[in-house]
A protein has these predicted regions:
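A short helix-loop-beta-strand connector motif used in the catalytic cores of GNAT acetyltransferases and
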Residues: 38-47
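Short amphipathic alpha-helix that is part of the acyltransferase structural core
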Residues: 1-33, 49, 145, 158-178
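Conserved GNAT acetyl-CoA-binding A-motif
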Residues: 96-111
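C-terminal "cap" of GNAT-fold acetyltransferases
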Residues: 110-113, 132-180
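Conserved beta-strand in the GNAT
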Residues: 47, 54-63, 67-74
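Conserved acetyl-CoA-binding loop-helix of GNAT-fold acetyltransferases
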Residues: 75, 81-94
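Conserved catalytic-core motifs of GNAT/GCN5-like acyltransferases
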Residues: 103, 116, 120-140
Length: 180
């Protein structure tokens, strides 16, 4: 049985190292920004601990009233393609009593297309007709075109606009109009 647990303060360095290995600087916060999020009651990081005690995988998420937003999902490069990412995602989805949402890069590269396929195999739907941009996470950065993926099927434009507004104001601390 997979043991997923909430990140402890002493796990921060290993978690941030995995985030840094898995996401370019423009798609994640710096260490101080990441650490500051840990005091937000809606934010959490769940980890899959290796038998050795290290961090094999992580999921950073935001628990909102109507959905859970999976902000960052990363698997240690040495553990990829072994099925633990899918198992962890399925286990987390089974524990939440509401829909989940995440952002994914447009399928413009083979890796981005494979990533979207992974999420589709685990119950997510790509809302491809909705134009969405992830605000810049670093000063001077550019917004990134992304797809919003949701569980429970495709969402209406009004539902996606509400999700976008909440993500931009709560997760990214920006207004949707300000990020364009």
């Amino acid at each position: 049985m997979m043991q997923i647990e909430r990140m402890r303060p002493e796990d921060f360095d290993a978690v941030f190292r995995l985030l840094s290995q898995s996401f370019p600087a423009g798609e994640r916060r710096d260490a101080a920004g990441q650490r500051a999020l840990l005091s937000d009651s809606a934010y959490r990081i769940d980890i899959l601990r290796a038998p050795s005690g290290g961090v094999q995988a992580l999921m950073a998420s935001w628990d909102f009233d109507d959905f859970v937003f999976f902000e960052h999902f990363a698997v240690d490069p040495a553990c990829r393609s072994g099925g633990i990412g899918g198992q962890m995602l399925d286990a987390l989805l089974a524990c939440i009593p509401k829909p989940a949402c995440l952002e994914a890069e447009l399928p413009e590269t083979e890796m981005a297309a494979r990533r979207i396929g992974f999420y589709e195999r685990h119950g997510f739907t790509v809302n491809a007709d909705y134009p969405y941009f992830q605000p810049a996470l670093v000063p001077g950065g550019s917004p990134l075109p992304m797809h919003l993926l949701t569980t429970g099927g495709a969402r209406t434009a009004a539902e996606l606009r509400a999700i976008e507004t909440l993500l931009h104001t709560r997760v990214y601390d920006k207004t949707p109009a300000a990020m364009i």
